[in-house]
């Protein structure tokens, strides 16, 4: 209450910011008349003047009024579009590294030109990030004439582009592209074997369009580059028969074999379920009689079983995926778009392939990965724009340090948003929706019906067909026709059924969009200028008549067939109507059978309905019900925020390690000589080895000279008479013998360099270092994934899982660095090179290409009981039945005793 009083007296933070920005808008407007007197060459020449001032040290902030005024005047001349005052405010918000919330139809694409132009003057590159290739190409194509007029170059970064084209795109002043492609390019740049192969420059400034979709909705799914791993494809096919033999529990503590937790999106086997699963696996000849699924040797079997259960119980056709051309194609749960080429991890995709009876592809091993949260935090300055950010303002501030500023609309919003109607059953709900659509169609009012899945969109399309109502369907299966359908969605009486994708980025113009038709007439060379003018005038007259008819009918009517988990996505659907002061209306139709109400709010709403004694076909329409539903959505949003925050806390551990690895890798790439690094590694490895077998501050009885000589000879081809030295010099310090061994290793290395030449040896060593850095990092990612999947179980031992994860991840990282040193030293010491040609051949072998797959994948903090892809571990020894004594050499080949190496992790 006190906060509300203070807000009324002093205004909100948003109000105060807008007041500051409006003062700058006045300064920009004051420059307009002077710029209008300049000819085109003088106006375009302002860019060179600004760049010269920036080079002399002038800050971009002080240039802002002039640069924005120049950009606005250039836009008016080149494109016939003059930035509104609210668009200038939006541009300033973006330049300040904040998020601008601007309603649909307020011209976000045009707004981005202002900060893009200003920041491009510094010459460090500006990235404009969109959600798909179509929008990136479209926006770059529309805005390129403006940027080119001002003397700036524009690039488009698309998937499947050749390497040279990508380098050209990044070399441009302003680069448009998708979030996925920018992220993948960053990962690929950190896998190259030559600095010349890189495409990206240092990450300076990014403007993220639909920032809520990219930084919130997709934050739980990391970008993954993977390569094929060894995998038993037949196992998925055989395991697919097991879920049908198990019984699903109707309640968490009810009878049955497994419980499906829809809130957490997980499957859990009961004790009885484990027993029945073991019996079924024995009958299928997958498990030996008397063996347990819990044993270390059967970890992989357990993994396959859980993947099969998840595929059958949690992932449904035409909701989570579609079958297209004999392949499983994932459907994006937030946009409804098909995500061709993406695959679920942890064997889930293969399990779904087995369930649907299509060809099963091999599982992949992660080569590199990063979350959008950590990728976009690499930019020195980050900004975003969207129509719906205010509901997630807290998360933007907490995770990214981005403040959200709500920009007022250019014209008042007059759309009428009605209260939700809640029915008992889905059938009653769909009957009411059909009645509403029929009424709108008869009155000539266009309707956009939003659904949450392909399945629901096709169900509704079937009902409309039965009712004889003409309609268009816009879902992932009709992706190719998306732009055409959206263009016509504002015509009188047109009914459009759409999934969440709803053509974001494309405005629905009341009366229909005639721009493509006008463009076709203008490009038709067979017509005379008069014919063109007449046809365009006739088109515009027809459009005006349709536009007036739609306005009279009430504008675009939005119907939501159910509430989404997030209020923001509901607001996105509503935001399709009421653009630029147009009239419009919206209403959501719900039933107690909808997933959100069934899982989170059904008891409360059902109790209200029973109290009111609602007859069949009647609906509740009350602010209490709408508030109850919004509270349910807040619960889900809060839970999803916690998941994303938890994911970030875990991924920050990997991110710190990723930075170290990538930094060292870049130093190797860019340094002229790596021989000093090789020498330091060799001395470190041999010193550690010596101390392991001949411990410092120990007596002679604790030394194992024979063991050390064997390891040096076998692993490093260093022959030294250590035992003879000790006998001949009983009073010598241990360091004396260590130094002799290091000198012997150095002499052998110098002989190799002399044989092949320093330059050839440098190239070979660089290739060896990079290859082993990449290989070790690849296995380390698998180890971290394996560690993360089971870390939540530490909570049962009264330990903090996050602290345990950080501690063990650091231990694994230290072991990985030791392994890199050891393996590189072994390779350089043992490789037989007698000529520069052999060095080049060995380098080519180390630099062998491998096929890669690019995924934007599901990322879980708490996974199934077991995972795959973990490197050498104590568990693998147990599974293989190997017994290792504490003082025996570790079987991993480190040369250390088992208790000082992998025995520490046992």
From Swiss-Prot:
GO biological process: intracellular protein transmembrane transport; protein import; protein targeting; protein transport by the Sec complex
Membrane-topology annotation of the record: Peripheral membrane protein
Binding site for ATP: 87, 105-109, 507
Cofactor binding description: May bind 1 zinc ion per subunit.
Location, primary (coarse class): membrane
Cofactors required: Zn(2+)
Binding locations of Zn(2+): 890, 892, 901-902
Catalytic activity, reaction form: ATP + H2O + cellular proteinSide 1 = ADP + phosphate + cellular proteinSide 2
Subcellular location(s) per record: Cell inner membrane; Cytoplasm
Enzyme class: translocase
Keyword 4Fe-4S: no
Listed GO MF terms: ATP binding; metal ion binding; protein-exporting ATPase activity
GO CC field: cell envelope Sec protein transport complex; cytosol; plasma membrane
Subunit note: Monomer and homodimer. Part of the essential Sec protein translocation apparatus which comprises SecA, SecYEG and auxiliary proteins SecDF-YajC and YidC.
Stated name of the protein: Protein translocase subunit SecA
Organism name: Laribacter hongkongensis (strain HLHK9)
Gene that encodes it: secA
């Amino acid at each position: 209450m006190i906060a509300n009083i203070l807000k009324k007296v002093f205004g909100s933070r948003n109000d105060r910011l807008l007041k500051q920005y409006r003062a700058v808008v006045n300064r920009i407007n004051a420059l307009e008349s002077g710029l209008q007197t300049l000819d085109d060459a003088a106006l375009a020449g302002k860019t060179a003047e600004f760049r010269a001032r920036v080079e002399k040290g002038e800050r971009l902030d002080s240039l802002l009024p002039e640069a924005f005024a120049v950009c606005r005047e250039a836009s008016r001349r080149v494109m016939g579009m003059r930035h509104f005052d609210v668009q200038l405010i939006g541009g300033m918000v973006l330049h300040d590294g904040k998020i601008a919330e601007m309603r649909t139809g307020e011209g976000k694409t045009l707004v981005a030109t202002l900060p893009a132009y200003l920041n491009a003057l510094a010459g460090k590159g500006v990235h404009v990030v969109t959600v798909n290739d179509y929008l990136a190409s479209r926006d770059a194509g529309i805005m390129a004439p403006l940027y080119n007029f001002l003397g700036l170059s524009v690039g488009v970064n698309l998937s499947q582009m050749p390497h040279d084209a990508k380098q050209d795109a990044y070399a441009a002043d302003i680069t448009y592209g998708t979030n996925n492609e920018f992220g993948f390019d960053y990962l690929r740049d950190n896998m190259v074997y030559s600095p010349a192969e890189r495409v990206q420059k240092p990450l300076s400034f990014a403007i993220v369009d639909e920032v809520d979709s990219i930084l919130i909705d997709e934050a739980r799914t990391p970008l993954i580059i993977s390569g094929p791993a060894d995998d038993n494809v037949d196992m998925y096919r055989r395991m697919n028969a097991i879920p049908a033999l198990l019984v699903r529990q109707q309640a968490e503590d009810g009878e049955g074999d497994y419980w499906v937790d829809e809130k957490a999106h997980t499957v859990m086997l009961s004790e009885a379920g484990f027993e029945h699963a073991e019996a079924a696996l024995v009958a299928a000849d997958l498990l030996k009689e008397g063996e347990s699924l819990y044993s270390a040797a059967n970890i992989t079997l357990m993994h396959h079983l859980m993947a099969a259960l998840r595929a059958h119980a949690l992932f449904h056709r035409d909701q989570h995926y579609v079958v297209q051309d004999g392949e499983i194609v994932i459907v994006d749960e937030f946009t409804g778009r098909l995500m061709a080429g993406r695959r679920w991890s942890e064997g889930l995709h293969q399990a779904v392939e087995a369930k649907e009876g299509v060809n099963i592809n091999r599982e992949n091993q992660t080569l590199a990965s990063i979350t959008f949260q950590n990728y976009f935090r690499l930019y020195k300055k980050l900004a975003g724009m969207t129509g719906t950010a205010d509901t997630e303002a807290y998360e933007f501030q907490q995770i990214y340090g981005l403040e959200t500023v709500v920009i007022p609309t250019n014209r008042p919003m007059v759309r009428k948003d009605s209260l939700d109607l809640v029915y008992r059953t889905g059938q009653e709900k769909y009957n009411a929706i059909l009645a509403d659509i029929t009424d709108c169609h008869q009155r000539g009012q266009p309707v956009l019906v939003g659904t949450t899945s392909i399945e629901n969109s096709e169900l509704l399309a079937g009902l409309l067909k039965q009712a004889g109502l003409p309609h268009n369907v816009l879902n992932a299966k009709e992706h190719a026709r998306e732009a055409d359908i959206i263009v016509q969605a504002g015509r009188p009486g047109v009914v459009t059924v759409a999934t969440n994708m709803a053509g974001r980025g494309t405005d629905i113009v009341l009366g229909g969009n005639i721009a493509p038709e006008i463009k076709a007439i203008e490009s038709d060379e067979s017509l005379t200028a008069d014919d063109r003018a007449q046809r365009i005038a006739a088109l515009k007259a027809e459009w005006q008549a349709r536009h007036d008819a739609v306005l009279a009918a009430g504008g675009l009517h939005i119907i939501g067939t159910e509430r989404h988990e997030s209020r923001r996505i509901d607001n996105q659907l509503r935001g399709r109507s009421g653009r630029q002061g147009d009239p419009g209306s919206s209403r959501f139709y719900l039933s107690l059978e909808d997933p959100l109400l069934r899982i989170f709010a059904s008891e409360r709403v059902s109790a209200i309905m029973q109290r009111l004694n609602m007859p069949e076909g009647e609906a509740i329409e009350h602010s209490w019900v709408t508030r109850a539903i919004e509270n349910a959505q807040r619960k889900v949003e809060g839970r999803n925020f916690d998941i994303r925050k938890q994911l970030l806390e875990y991924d920050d551990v990997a991110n710190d390690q990723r930075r170290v690895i990538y930094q060292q890798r870049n130093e190797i790439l860019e340094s002229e000589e790596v021989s000093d690094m090789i020498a330091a590694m060799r001395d470190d490895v041999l010193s550690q080895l010596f101390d392991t077998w001949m411990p410092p501050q120990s007596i002679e009885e604790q030394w194992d000279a024979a063991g050390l000589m064997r390891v040096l000879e076998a692993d490093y081809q260093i022959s030294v008479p250590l035992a003879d030295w000790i006998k001949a010099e009983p009073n010598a310090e241990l360091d004396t013998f260590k130094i002799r061994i290091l000198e012997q290793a150095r002499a052998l290395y110098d002989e190799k360099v002399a044989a092949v030449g320093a330059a050839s040896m440098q190239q070979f060593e660089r290739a060896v270092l990079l290859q082993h850095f990449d290989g070790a990092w690849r296995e380390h990612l698998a180890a971290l994934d394996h560690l993360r999947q089971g870390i939540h179980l530490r909570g049962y031992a009264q330990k903090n899982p996050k602290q345990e994860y950080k501690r063990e991840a650091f231990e694994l990282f230290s072991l990985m660095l030791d392994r890199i040193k050891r393996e590189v030293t072994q390779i350089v010491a043992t490789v037989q090179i007698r000529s520069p040609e052999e060095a080049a051949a060995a380098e080519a072998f180390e630099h062998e290409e491998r096929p890669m797959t690019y995924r934007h994948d599901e990322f879980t903090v708490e996974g199934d009981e077991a995972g795959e892809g973990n490197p050498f571990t104590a568990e693998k020894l147990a599974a293989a039945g190997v017994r290792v004594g504490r003082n025996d050499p570790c079987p991993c080949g480190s040369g250390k005793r088992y208790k000082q190496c992998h025995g520490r992790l046992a």
